[in-house]
Curated annotation (Swiss-Prot):
Pathway: Cofactor metabolism; pyridoxal 5'-phosphate salvage; pyridoxal 5'-phosphate from pyridoxal: step 1/1
UniProt-listed HAMAP family: PdxY
Record function comment: Pyridoxal kinase involved in the salvage pathway of pyridoxal 5'-phosphate (PLP). Catalyzes the phosphorylation of pyridoxal to PLP.
Quaternary structure (record): Homodimer.
MF terms in GO: ATP binding; magnesium ion binding; pyridoxal kinase activity
Cofactor(s) essential for the protein: Mg(2+)
Organism placement in taxonomy: Bacteria, Thermotogati, Deinococcota, Deinococci, Deinococcales
Binding positions for substrate per the UniProt entry: S18, D235
Catalytic activity: pyridoxal + ATP = pyridoxal 5'-phosphate + ADP + H(+)
Enzyme class of the recorded protein, top EC level: transferase
This protein's name: Pyridoxal kinase PdxY
Amino acid sequence: MTSSSAPVLPQNILSIQSWVSYGHVGNAAALFPLQRLGFEVWTINTVQFSNHTGYGEWTGSVFPPELVADLLNGIAARGVLPTCAAVLSGYMGSEGTVSAVVEAVRRVREANPAALYCCDPVMGDVGRGVFVRPELPDLIRTQAVPEADIVTPNQFELELLTGRRVTRLQEALDASRMLRGTLREGGPRLVVVTSLVREDAPQGVIETLAVTGEGAWLCRTPLLPLDPPRNGTGDAIAALFLGHYLRTQDAGTALSLSMSALFAVLDLTHRVGTREIQLVAAQDEYTRPSRVFEAERVA
């Protein structure tokens, strides 16, 4: 007679980001992919808007930073913080929100020292420049990034965080290693550079680079002609990478799976021609991508 094995509960992730009622940015881009990967997600929303600001008009409210601490107090009162495997943060619109997120990370780590913090340092992008308040890049660099185990800047944000110009692969590697040196000691110190377009890459592609202490991996996908560029892709890739990294504990594998999933989302979005990314319609791609883009070791 054999005894049945005990059920395995999902890992828990605390995600502190913006929220929109319509469309997919912030937590509305991170929540479902993480759930589809098998995680429980505790969301704390920093804003509640009707839609993302890329439309030029929206309704809703920005929540006070104190709400982050208040909601975390309520979660902590349930006695579950020791079960939190990771914290994910995205757009932080004020100095108070940066401080509140950093304090939330510290409280989770007090309860579970093994918990990871994945910081998506949303500050700007190529073609748009810095789109947050002028004081925020320095605050994110000096307060949030040093607490992070994983950081997911786009190419523009990598340059902003390091003060280095990135146009070639070696420059991207050097800047990523420089940024790695500022992350929290004791963690994986993993830098994931998204939306990488470099002079020495093949034409018609876009890349993501993952750099750890053990090496570096590059994943390349076709560059789809999405005009205008779709909002929420950075939020989605940060969530997908974190989820796959927690599942595999391997940066190269997580990079390949997350980029393959994101390409499928964007390819479907392009084919149907919608302004919002097709996160729900492409959900099967999160766990079993129909087209796998391998991560090539480059260092």
